[in-house]
């Protein structure tokens, strides 16, 4: 029969093993989230540029406005 000290040591080693596995899992999740965030930042920059182009294209000078055709 293991002594109290041996039982405690076995319990601590078991907890450490589980915590190490959890840290590895969380590290993988964080790395995946980092990749997702980087991809989303690129998409936002692209969309912001496209929106800016649309806004600049819709704001023309008054000379560019043609009068509507009359029937």
Swiss-Prot record:
| UniProt record similarity statement | Belongs to the SlyX family.
Q: By its UniProt entry, which Pfam families does this protein fall under?
A: SlyX
Protein name stated in the entry: Protein SlyX homolog
Q: Which InterPro entries match?
A: SlyX
Question: Which species is listed as the source?
Answer: Rhodospirillum rubrum (strain ATCC 11170 / ATH 1.1.1 / DSM 467 / LMG 4362 / NCIMB 8255 / S1)
